[in-house]
Amino acid sequence: RVAGIVNLVLRNGHVVHYEATGKRGSENEMAMEVDVLFRIYSMTKPVTSVAAMQLYEQGKFQLSDPVTKFVPELKDLKVLNEDGQFEPVKQVMTMHQLLMHTAGMSYGFNAQNDLVDQLYLRADLSSAANLDEFVVRLAKLPLRSQPGERYHYSVAVDVTGLIVERISGQRLDEYIKEHILEPLEMNDTFFEVPEDKRDRFTQNHFINPETGTLVNSDYAPAPYGYRKGVALSDFFDVTLFAGGAGLVFTAMDYARFAEMLRRGGELDGVRILGPKTIKFMTRNHLAEDSMH
């Protein structure tokens, strides 16, 4: 079912198991190594959220702030309700809702059965040249629910990445590198894989549901929710820094990030976030009846 795996287990901050097994891809006979670079997709989201919360700690925004304070492009959004009718937004979309995936946005993963997701898929957000163009396209799409009404996994963290850019005055990749990756010595984490490290970059795969075999999706048509016939993302010449899905990392690098969170925002004497902020971030912010 998989070509290769890197297993890394930490207990109380100490490595107790670290092993690579298998090969690097369905079309790559090279042995898997512990320093291989993987696309981490949605594991990018906590990194972007930490970047945003650093700015929150500095007083650069409040969780009650309207998203339109930083992204005015979203001021005229409509909601496509379950009856297929457009209705006005009833309350302001807040930064807190954006970080909780309760802002009413979507992703396009259920395009076969959902009209809003079909519109997301047609908008082809991932082909935008940069985050500014991304949000211009997003602004033309309807919300699937009223802000704050329910949880739905979405592109909200990509919008958060744009807000990090606009508040900090830095590109998202530059901000994350300076304020998170370099302080934590995460030297193998990138939005764009350096040329001298591309030999460690793994192939991307999905499982063919009809045959149960691995398919290299760098070349094959992609599953639902992505553009057909192209790689899921380009990690060699990046201009769209996707805060929700854009990073590449090694297992050890992400372990350092996770250990920083476990220790309350600090690792090896370097503080990334305050312990109260970490405690706030890791509590349950969703009511049970909103988990739809």
Question: Which residues fall in each region the model found?
Answer:
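PAS-family sensory domains
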Residues: V67-T68, V92
